[in-house]
Amino acid sequence: AAGARFFAGYPITPASEITEGMSVRLPLVGGVFLQMEDEIASMGAAIGASMAGAKCLTATSGPGFSLKQEGIGIASMMEIPVVIVDVMRGGPASGMSTLPSQMDVMQARWGCHGDHPIIVLSPATVTECYELAIKAFNLAELIRQPVIILSDAIVGHLRERIDLPDPSEVKVIDRKMTTKSPEEYAPFEAEEDGVPCFAGRGTAYRYHMCSNVHTEKGFPADTNHAVASKLLARLHKKLENYEDEITAYKFFGSEDCETLIVAYGLSLIHISEPTRP
């Protein structure tokens, strides 16, 4: 529904059902499914396909999520839209491959080195899995940003009857494309909202992109502190500009309560009912 047309992944419990499902579904809608040799390669393939213009997805669990961190950092620095699903399991290391946990929340936020923001969405129901998947792709394309869907083994295996909206009613956001000429275009020159526009690959636009600190033209400037400060400030600011679109929560109970419990994913399933008035 969100327009995903490329998946690269490596089977890992308890996220393998996503890989299996995409292997069946994507060819039916003209998409591409790739089973890669490992988690690092699958992250790199998703980044590359997104750079070429596709809406991309990859899925994994704890050990694979660790291996994808460098790629997530690259996507953040190069401002490449990509959705990463982490179906959490118990850890550390190989951990408990078939049992649930919520142990990856800190890694989801601070798993990469360097100072960059990240968007994390955490569904608690099958309906939210559907809705937040669409939201993840929309935010990734709108803000040019990797987005993590933080699920878990319980939520990932839930079966519920839900009502799906008509496809015509689903809001789908595509990436902004430049209106400037190839001579004027700079791949990292931001618009008013702090987000640069893309240019079509395979067209007259020829430009450079790298994961170093870079100029608006995309060339390395990794010894220039002024360029680095300006770039990092913009990477943070563009998310702040869309804070209202990113942030979402549900409140249960009385607003004059003395105790506030914050929950997400599987834990929300267990505490939402007891906290109702």
Summary of predicted features, one role per range:
Residues 2-3, 23-29, 85-87, 111-117, ...:
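Gly-rich Lys/Arg/Thr-decorated short loops/hinges at beta-loop-alpha junctions or inter-strand turns
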